[in-house]
Amino acid sequence: MSENTFSDTTSIYNQNLSNQGFILANLENLVSWARTRSLWPMTFGLACCAIEMMQTAGSRYDMDRYGMLFRPSPRQADVMIVAGTLTNKMAPALRRVYDQMTEPKWVISMGSCANGGGYYHYSYSVVRGCDKIVPVDIYVPGCPPTPEALLYGILQLQKKINRTQQVKFKR
């Protein structure tokens, strides 16, 4: 009786599966899809670019539709958005926050000041680009960059994540 019940259940399952279809994907595509649609940024707002970053998270542009949810702790974040002028005094704090982030981690440099010093490039107290402190994946130009530019940078980061290998297999 138990064999008969098992075969009936299996045949019903197979009929339902053939009627609905199924999805074929490898683990690499699944992990890339999940990571690109659940980016959690850590805000590192240093100047006026941070205002534009906040506007991007508002209701008009709604970063949440891309799966982005700002996290208050670097241990919960996988993307750091450096927005604004990075001074020499703030550089060790930036590196410390970056080191506390979990792997894999990505950095978006937002604005002319974060990209290369911007208006304050020749000042003695300004780091001429946050890429001297942390590795940067995406540069968003502008002074200040518009929310659309930041969203475009986020979309470029998603494309970059899809292109890179996410799963490392041990042999």
UniProtKB/Swiss-Prot annotation:
Membrane topology: Peripheral membrane protein
Cofactor(s) the record lists: [4Fe-4S] cluster
InterPro entries: NADH_UbQ_OxRdtase-like_20kDa, NADH_UQ_OxRdtase_20Kd_su
4Fe-4S is among the record's keywords: yes
Keywords: 4Fe-4S, Cell inner membrane, Cell membrane, Iron, Iron-sulfur, Membrane, Metal-binding, NAD, Quinone, Translocase, Transport, Ubiquinone
Positions bound to [4Fe-4S] cluster: 48-49, 113, 143
Annotated Pfam families: Oxidored_q6
Molecular function per GO: 4 iron, 4 sulfur cluster binding; iron ion binding; NADH dehydrogenase (ubiquinone) activity; NADH:ubiquinone reductase (non-electrogenic) activity; quinone binding
Assembly: NDH-1 is composed of 14 different subunits. Subunits NuoB, C, D, E, F, and G constitute the peripheral sector of the complex.
GO cellular component: a single term: plasma membrane
Family of the protein in this entry: Belongs to the complex I 20 kDa subunit family.
Gene responsible for this protein: nuoB
Organism: Orientia tsutsugamushi (strain Boryong)
Protein name: NADH-quinone oxidoreductase subunit B
Gene Ontology biological-process entries: aerobic respiration; electron transport coupled proton transport
Protein origin, superkingdom: Bacteria
Magnesium keyword on record: no
Location (main, coarse): membrane
PANTHER family for the chain: NADH DEHYDROGENASE, NADH DEHYDROGENASE [UBIQUINONE] IRON-SULFUR PROTEIN 7, MITOCHONDRIAL
EC top class, as a word: translocase
